[in-house]
From Swiss-Prot:
Keyword Translocase among UniProt keywords: no
Organism: Bifidobacterium longum (strain NCC 2705)
Superkingdom of source: Bacteria
Signal peptide: none
Record's protein name: Small ribosomal subunit protein uS5
Amino acid sequence: MAEETQNTVATESNNEDRKGRRGQRGEGRRGERRNRREENHGDELLDRVVTINRVSKTHKGGRTFSFAALVVVGDGNGTVGVGYGKSREVPAAIAKGQLDAKKHMFSVPRVRGTITHPVQGHDAAGTVLLRPAAPGTGVIAGGSVRAVMECAGITDVLTKSMGSATAVNVVRATVDALKQLEEPEEIAARRGLALDEVAPDALLRARAAGIAEARKAREEAAAAKAAEEKDGE
């Protein structure tokens, strides 16, 4: 009888140990997933679905339908990318487009929410012209170009689309134009000229004001953080 009692106690103890280990493993997995979600939430990006096309492919047994999504992704602060995704379901096509856009992100030179100089981009039969604009002008553009500007963080710009009106051509022409943008220092160095001979005074003043505003915002944020830490102590 004593042996049976000891065996029962040992079995219950082993079961509790296994449950404890399973609980720890489960909690570890849940914790990892929770951490990944928090990291992804903290690294959020803007995304815009420009267009979704239905594609049909004919086989011997009939036709197969799929969807193609053109997606723009950016951080709203000078970085943007465009991607194209295909799948038999719309959500999967959009997800693939987002991943493709994140792989092709690039930086866009800006001065207080506008571009540094006029530029023209091309793709196939599509042409897009971009011009700097004064603060408060807004984004004067169609839906396809506007999506790229919003994700890139450009708030004031004048645009004109010529030639093909296909969304894919317009977006790619816009990206081609943005990739041609240069900082004034780069243009001056390439031409062997002084900075004030390349960039207009208004542009240089606007950039200096933007840099001063950004520095002030960083200092205020650092001071607020230091005050919070001091109050917490």
